């Protein structure tokens, strides 16, 4: 008689007699959903499931019913243990989570040195103790762990079982095995013999660069520190350039920060080894639109030059302490605007040399962009010059002396200071109702305007557009010629701008501008970017679809090649008083001084509509640009000290009441707009009172949504006041009001 082998032993999840403590030890190297089934040592014949979730191990007794069936939850009973495990691997049904990954058995033989596929990077997952989850990655989750052998804290990237991206995950590991540089995150090992797959890398103390920039102490992370960070990233990318790798997802969210402002490039999920000049992504591949070069959006073509474009956007993120690129612009509009020669403006306080480098990275033709070797050399040159912080301090101090705001402008921090005095002076010639969003659209209507006003912002500086020649090593001779021609062209634009009408100026500049390479068919242009919004999730509060409506209307109706004053088609439908509070609709508890102040300053309003002088369209662009750290300050801005949390909350309630009364046909559409304008003005004044930086970001985004919704209601009052469209429009407005209220209450 031969005793039959216990059929349970063939299952990877069955561990036989194992104590509770031993089960917890075996699961210490697992992740959410790691489990085992064991026989109780203290109670022979009794079995339990041990399941790990969020750093804890949960134990569930497997019960036997009177009819011999097995169950954990009495509602679901099974004939065999295998059936029970299979059921709970698809639905939790009483467990903390579903059963995903069987824990490795203690006596599993090693195959090191025996397998023909032996890999020196492969390590036993039992060598790693998993701790808490740090966040999500390209294909799975990232955990903090400890490498037991060395008591070393590590980061462990895992693959989500349901992503079916095993091949892509293993490609990332393959890339990391080939690279080693002080500013690239170092691979320590992999576990790829069985799921769950692990990539183990060094642990970076301060997490990703995007969150670090948004939450850092700006006295400590000064202009020089920001420059040092950019230098390190350019060094890492120069190394990848030499090794013929492309990253394809270069952004602040994919860089990590360690001690002493050490920065390393990470997240190689989209990286590829180049075998030719370009890499063509497969159809349906998703990319972060705002960081992706035009040729990549249009044709799915990637090269090291498309990484250079992304580096320019990353520089802009650094210079703005983590602002989301193209603020207020919908994803579907980005490619169209870039094609019309729109580029993001120079962040406040950003040195001209650094901005010129950004603009060089954003050349439409990939061949016109600098190499990473040139970029790195340019940063090394700038960093060795102590004048970089002096330049920032000088620019900020210069603005401070214009109107006695020097006390706000002392520290040499890049984008955190506002151009208060400059705004006050320039607002005399510009209508208060022109919002940053509208001004950006005027840039699309006249590509030259974006360049002209940048010149005005840096007037008196000796650098100008010729700065890249000194800020970075000279590129090949044809590039130098192009740079000089570009510099001459800019001088021509600047002088023509002051002496000619915008309509004529625009026509001439259109002739000067070299034609970009032919983009794809119209459907491809608009379609490509719109397909890939998913990776925008890495942004903090990116623009919402709400903003798309008015922007799309204006973009369609505006042809930059037509004669006439730029932005004419845009100004007509935009009434002049969106941000202006109305004294007739005071929310309860509102102090008298904030309301009376704006209502006594109506002087600029006649110029805000169709009668605005055409030349004034160019003047306020630099002063009213959107800044992450400061909202624009129209002349009627109320002193922030007079606007309290209660005032804002009362104003939100007043707007909700006006909407409710309008729905019941007890109040007019204009009453809703009036209450909305009051709320907008109070919010703009209140934003600087918010201490927590993350809340401040969210609040600014909410203000932008509110402004966009008010504009839509104001442009289309007939639609908004009748039929089912009213509910939809007011629901958008109510959503932004609720968002504002929630943030203020935090």
From Swiss-Prot:
SMART domains: FABD (SM00808), SH2 (SM00252), TyrKc (SM00219)
Catalytic activity: L-tyrosyl-[protein] + ATP = O-phospho-L-tyrosyl-[protein] + ADP + H(+)
GO molecular function, a single term: ATP binding
Chain intervals with Basic and acidic residues compositional bias: 498-508
Chain residues that bind ATP: 134-142, 157, 202-208
Record: active site: 249 (proton acceptor)
Record-linked Pfam families: F_actin_bind, PK_Tyr_Ser-Thr, SH2
Intervals of motif Kinase activation loop: 267-291
Domain Protein kinase: 128-379
Enzyme class: transferase
Enzyme Commission code(s) on record: 2.7.10.2
CDD domains: PTKc_Abl (cd05052), SH2_ABL (cd09935)
Annotated keywords: ATP-binding, Kinase, Nucleotide-binding, Oncogene, SH2 domain, Transferase, Tyrosine-protein kinase
Record carries keyword Kinase: yes
Segments forming domain SH2: 13-103
Classification via InterPro entries: ABL_SH2, F-actin-binding, Kinase-like_dom_sf, Non-receptor_tyrosine_kinases, Prot_kinase_dom, Protein_kinase_ATP_BS, Ser-Thr/Tyr_kinase_cat_dom, SH2
Biased composition (Low complexity): 592-602
Family, as annotated: Belongs to the protein kinase superfamily. Tyr protein kinase family. ABL subfamily.
Note, other: This protein is synthesized as a Gag-Abl polyprotein.
Name listed for the protein in its UniProt record: Tyrosine-protein kinase transforming protein Abl
Species this chain originates from: Abelson murine leukemia virus
Gene transcribed to yield this protein: ABL
